[in-house]
Amino acid sequence: MGLIKKIFGTHSEREIKLIRPTADKIEALEPDMMKLSDDELRGKTIEFKNRLKNGETLDDILVEAYAVVREAAKRTLGNRAYYVQLLGGIILHQGRISEMRTGEGKTLTSTFPAYLNALEGEGVHIVTVNDYLAKRDAEWMGEVHRFLGLSVGCILNDMDNDERRKAYNCDITYATNNELGFDYLRDNMVIYKEQLVMRDLHFAIIDEVDSVLIDEARTPLIISGQSGKSTRLYEACDILARQLTKGTAKELSKMDIIMKEDDQETGDFVVNEKEKAVNLTAEGVEKVERFFKIENLADPENLEIQHNIILALRAHYLMAIDKDYVVKDDEVLIVDDFTGRIMPGRRYSDGLHQAIEAKEHVKVKRESKTLATITFQNFFNKYTKKCGMTGTALTEENEFREIYGMDVVEVPTNRPVARIDKDDAVYRTKREKLNAVINAIVEAHKAGQPVLVGTITIEASEEISELLKKKNIPHKVLNAKFHELEAEIIADAGQKGAVTIATNMAGRGTDIKLGEGVTELGGLKIIGTERHESRRIDNQLRGRSGRQGDPGESCFYICLEDDLMRLFGSERLNTIFKSLGLPEGEQIEHKMLSGAIEKAQKKIEDNNFGIRKNLLEYDKVNNEQREIIYAERRKVLNGDSMRDVIFKMITDNVETCVNTSISDDQLPEEWDLAELNQMLLPIIPMEPVELKDNELRHMKRNELIHMLKEKAVKLYEEKEAEFPEKEHLREVERVVLLRVIDRKWMDHIDDMDQLRQGIGLQAYGQRDPKTEYKFSGFEMFDTMINAITEDTVKALMHVRIEQKVEREEVAKVTGTNRDESVAKAPVKRATKKVQPNDPCPCGSGKKYKHCCGGVGRI
């Protein structure tokens, strides 16, 4: 393999070779562009648009368009794009991922494909990881686009619908991945076309593409409302969890399994940190049964107790404060494992968040009901074309290609990387490692060399901060607790003598520029205090030093007590190093170590990829169903032939009722008309079906269906005649159908969740869980479609002209993952309330509860 690479070069080198001629042509146009006046340069935009209308393609005008953008950036920002940025811009236009090192100017690179693709007039979305970067880039890079006559918008969390609509209608829109995803979901919940804010998803340029499409791929975007479920069980389970004793389980060897040895478990429960799972022992099950006064915890009616006690134990033994979450203002806030940022509004699902709230003695919020949901994988695959930029993507190249169909091309740096990446410094214990880290910081600080210390948890950053205070070393801490000061702290991290401690540096988005005299001192020194489970995150930390050919150095300090080493095979290493009799504090150097670390990281990366791939396979079923529902919903929203749709629903309902109550092989005298009436009349309030003997003898089932269809259609035509303007009824039909679709779809999402949670049991029956999930999911989907038809006809057949159609605004989402929407106040009516046993106001002669009171009111 190494020989082939030497002869033919890497994949990236071969691809770069192919696009260099295009970049050379752009370079050659620079003198011509410099001669143009501002107005002439601006006029090129109209010229390009006309050329596209006349049949030219984007590829035809790419060279000239990129030369125009380069000159515009020089005049507005004072920045002349490097040759490598032109290469990156060409790769992005091709719908690929451009891997560009930190400090190589990814932000400016994005202006090239953004301008070119915006000329089509269908909108370009530039996706950033936070509001700060979206606003900054829209103002900063927006200058280039505005100079060239394009409109630039920015979506921020606190914007209303009118502001969002205006921003999405711009040629180029900057927004976070979360805002885009939520706006897409909200657009598929609106009742009126005028409430839509987005255009079609045309072209997306994703900054920090690995963070968005890989790190956040497992977290679905969820819009949710409050459910009526009590929170007392969480509090009760938390009390019990504190009383249970943690035990251990002996891992069975192959010989034990052959000899049919039983698991040797102690205590009430055991924790498996590798699998992030908790299991009750037989003793623990008995204690739970005694506590809740139940006979058998495994009974179906006790599944909720079983689920909640496991959640409480997970909250206590697998979720750590200041690592996985922080408590701020009487609220539990999640910390992003990859970026170290707080994620306001995001809540763990399946009740885990409530279990943590009970553990931390803050107010336990009620569980929420999912109204709409989508994963980033499926959302970004909806774009006609997408591309991405990042400093580190090659380690996940296979995943990008397999799941997103995106190629990764490494762009060469503008200047050679001068940073020195040292081998890992390995110690036996955490105490020895921390001493070595502090000594390295003190030494660099004395020399005036700036130091950036990267930690994995908030707890670790605060521990190092305390140790530095004892040494009187001035420093700044950047973690999820203090992220408001983020940009300011990072901007100063390259100054002489600066010491900065930061939790994961992924997606920080701010360059660290070296202060005066720092280059001579060796540049920025990076110290990693622990290896992350992803090599990519380690590379991102390293990449903060040595930008644009600056000097720098990086080194990771690790010990055999670190989580990564502890969980993945350090026991054997520990035994070996103990036997060597090394004195305390001495650094261990052994070729086995680097191999063990690399192997552990690769193992976790492969495992995480497997989880994401598995999630996508299950979500594919949900996605296909979502596509159908949202497409049908959009047709209704646009008002496409509503009358025909409703009449078909009415006739379909008649046919379903007849086919269900009367089988094909029954003789007419065997027909159960009472059952038919029982099914049909609550939906379509027609006269009961009564046939005399002589009528029955000469009637076929198809004739009965035809007769009932005619009656039902006539009944609805009479309803139609009650409306002075036909468009009023069409409006009512639209609103009723949309609300029924939304209600049934929300229930279906819950049902699919329940199915997903229980589908693993199918494996015990020698059946493939994924196949069963797909089969059962589509059966449930068919049932939902039939229910939508039935409920819509039922509601419309009972609608009255005096009833006002209420416009309903969709709940605004203010979170990164979930929205705990406040329940809406009921709509007040001026009319007198009708009691269930009163005569129905519609004049049918029936009691209200058996007539209009039995159907959904509008």
From Swiss-Prot:
Pfam families membership = P-loop_SecA, SEC-C, SecA_DEAD, SecA_PP_bind, SecA_SW
Q: Name one GO cellular component term.
A: cytosol
Q: Which GO terms describe its biological process?
A: intracellular protein transmembrane transport; protein import; protein targeting; protein transport by the Sec complex
Family matches, as InterPro entries? Helicase_ATP-bd, Helicase_C-like, P-loop_NTPase, SEC_C_motif, SecA, SecA_CS, SecA_DEAD, SecA_motor_DEAD
List cofactor names only: Zn(2+)
Q: What are the record keywords, sorted?
A: ATP-binding, Cell membrane, Cytoplasm, Membrane, Metal-binding, Nucleotide-binding, Protein transport, Translocase, Translocation, Transport, Zinc
PROSITE patterns (UniProt xref): SECA, SECA_MOTOR_DEAD
Does Nuclease show up as a keyword for this record?
no
- List ligand-binding residues for Zn(2+): 840, 842, 851-852
SUPFAM superfamilies in UniProt: Helical scaffold and wing domains of SecA, P-loop containing nucleoside triphosphate hydrolases, Pre-protein crosslinking domain of SecA
Q: How is the cofactor bound?
A: May bind 1 zinc ion per subunit.
EC annotation from Swiss-Prot or TrEMBL: 7.4.2.8
Extract the PANTHER family matched here.
CHLOROPLAST PROTEIN-TRANSPORTING ATPASE, SECA INNER MEMBRANE COMPONENT OF SEC PROTEIN SECRETION SYSTEM
How does this protein assemble? Monomer and homodimer. Part of the essential Sec protein translocation apparatus which comprises SecA, SecYEG and auxiliary proteins SecDF. Other proteins may also be involved.
Q: Which HAMAP family match?
A: SecA
Q: What is this protein called?
A: Protein translocase subunit SecA
Q: Give the species.
A: Lachnoclostridium phytofermentans (strain ATCC 700394 / DSM 18823 / ISDg)
